[in-house]
Curated annotation (Swiss-Prot):
The modification N-acetylmethionine is found at M1. Residues 48-72 are annotated as: Disordered. Belongs to the beclin family. The keyword Phosphoprotein applies. A homodimeric form is proposed to exist; this metastable form readily transits to ATG14- or UVRAG-containing complexes with BECN1:UVRAG being more stable than BECN1:ATG14. Component of the PI3K (PI3KC3/PI3K-III/class III phosphatidylinositol 3-kinase) complex the core of which is composed of the catalytic subunit PIK3C3, the regulatory subunit PIK3R4 and BECN1 associating with additional regulatory/auxiliary subunits to form alternative complex forms. This is Beclin-1. Plays a central role in autophagy. Acts as a core subunit of the PI3K complex that mediates formation of phosphatidylinositol 3-phosphate; different complex forms are believed to play a role in multiple membrane trafficking pathways: PI3KC3-C1 is involved in initiation of autophagosomes and PI3KC3-C2 in maturation of autophagosomes and endocytosis. Involved in regulation of degradative endocytic trafficking and required for the abscission step in cytokinesis, probably in the context of PI3KC3-C2. Essential for the formation of PI3KC3-C2 but not PI3KC3-C1 PI3K complex forms. Beclin-1-C 35 kDa localized to mitochondria can promote apoptosis; it induces the mitochondrial translocation of BAX and the release of proapoptotic factors. Residues 142-269 form a coiled coil. The modification Phosphothreonine is found at T119. The modification Phosphoserine is found at S15, S30, S90, S93, S96.
């Protein structure tokens, strides 16, 4: 409730608010002229004669300690109870208040305060008689009326249903009643039977539930075993893949090894180890030049290395054939290889030289080269024993220490260095290497092709 004061007219304006939307209300002018009779009619609760009898109402009021009330019968069958004015005026209310302000005289202020108090008490009584708090604005009242209309329609429909049921019951005779009793007994028996079936079903349900728990436990165990088997399978699968990779790797290695083996089988050890060729006027073995020219002074270390490879080649060919040389024994010793005389073992014939003045006066180097030529001749003769068609391109004269160019110029070239030119000595060495190359080819064809 709100209040405002106007100082010119010395009047007080008081307004109430809606109990739902809290909007300020402007009361109707009829609230200003309320008399006691009107107030009693507005605040009296509505009861029908069927719901409450006068005697019972009076007895209840007497027992409850309430003040007596006046019941006024009406033509519409509704009794109205009126609360005595003295009680209403003395009721303490939540809307009660004391008006303090200025007025033209004391009587007017007292009348205004009394009227507002009566109005507030009236709203409290109306709120106590119903489930709705008062006052309400017009919109909230319309909403409330719509709700009450809905409840009224529902209640009327229920009432109509009850009336129809009552009419049906009143129209039924005794036979129908007995028949209904029999049906009721049958339904009771059916209910007992269904209850028994329900109990049996409940027992079966418990049994099925127990079986279900067992099956679920078994299923869980099987799931665990399946997971374990899956893990083992995955591990075995991984191992299988690793073994497959290893197998493929081994197979690849075997194929590669087989290819290498086939290649090695086709490879001639002598041809691969001893490569005899020529470089200009020089005969070469494993890229070492054998001989020297005035225009090309080959180092003696290279010549000695070439002689070492040559001795090693003839020694290997003889061992392959099982040939043992007469008069001399080959001793491969790198660039210090030599021949050992079988008649005089203390005599060594070196196939190496350092040059200088000593080279011209010491003839051991020449004797060693002639002895080596003798060994080549023995190798040729050994081959001819088994292969009569075998022939070397250059004929060798061991006694003179010369090699003849039978297929070319027909000249003879000494293998010695003393009293010989470097050109002829180099050519003789070249022809000797050519004969060894032919011997190498024959040995390869006889032993390795088989």
């Amino acid at each position: 409730m709100e209040g405002s004061k106007t100082s010119n007219n010395s009047t007080m304006q008081v307004s109430f608010v809606c109990q739902r939307c809290s909007q300020p209300l402007k009361l109707d002018t009829s609230f200003k002229i309320l008399d006691r009779v009107t107030i009693q009619e507005l605040t009296a609760p509505l009861l029908t004669t069927a719901q409450a009898k006068p005697g019972e109402t009076q007895e209840e009021e007497t027992n409850s300690g309430e003040e007596p009330f006046i019941e006024t019968p009406r033509q519409d069958g509704v009794s109205r109870r009126f609360i005595p004015p003295a009680r209403m005026m003395s009721t303490e209310s939540a809307n009660s208040f004391t008006l303090i302000g200025e007025a033209s005289d004391g009587g007017t202020m007292e009348n205004l305060s009394r009227r507002l108090k009566v109005t507030g008490d009236l709203f409290d009584i109306m709120s106590g008689q119903t489930d709705v708090d008062h006052p309400l604005c017009e919109e909230c009242t319309d909403t409330l009326l719509d709700q009450l209309d809905t409840q009224l329609n529902v209640t009327e429909n229920e009432c109509q249903n009850y009336k129809r049921c009552l009419e049906i019951l009143e129209q039924m005779n005794e036979d129908d009643s007995e028949q209904l009793q029999m049906e009721l007994k049958e339904l009771a028996l059916e209910e007992e039977r269904l209850i028994q079936e329900l109990e049996d079903v409940e027992k079966n349900r418990k049994i099925v539930a127990e079986n279900l728990e067992k099956v679920q436990a078994e299923a869980e165990r099987l799931d665990q075993e399946e997971a374990q088997y899956q893990r083992e399978y995955s591990e075995f699968k991984r191992q299988q893949l690793e073994l497959d990779d290893e197998l493929k790797s081994v197979e690849n290695q075997m194929r590669y090894a087989q290819m290498q083996l086939d290649k090695l089988k086709k490879t001639n050890v002598f041809n691969a180890t001893f490569h005899i060729w020529h470089s200009g006027q020089f005969g070469t073995i494993n890229n070492f030049r054998l001989g020297r020219l005035p225009s090309v002074p080959v180092e003696w270390n290279e010549i000695n290395a070439a002689w070492g490879q040559t001795v090693l080649l003839l020694h290997a060919l003889a061992n392959k054939m099982g040939l043992k040389f007469q008069r001399y024994r080959l001793v491969p010793y790198g660039n210090h290889s030599y021949l050992e005389s079988l008649t005089d073992k203390s005599k060594e014939l070196p196939l190496y030289c350092s040059g200088g003045l000593r080279f011209f006066w010491d003839n051991k180097f020449d004797h060693a080269m002639v002895a080596f030529l003798d060994c080549v001749q023995q190798f040729k003769e050994e081959v001819e024993k088994g292969e009569t068609r075998f022939c070397l391109p250059y004929r060798m004269d061991v006694e003179k220490g010369k090699i003849e160019d039978t297929g070319g110029s027909g000249g003879s070239y000494s293998i010695k260095t003393q009293f010989n030119s470097e050109e002829q000595w180099t050519k003789a060495l070249k022809f000797m290497l050519t004969n060894l190359k032919w011997g190498l080819a024959w040995v390869s064809s006889q032993f390795y092709n088989k």
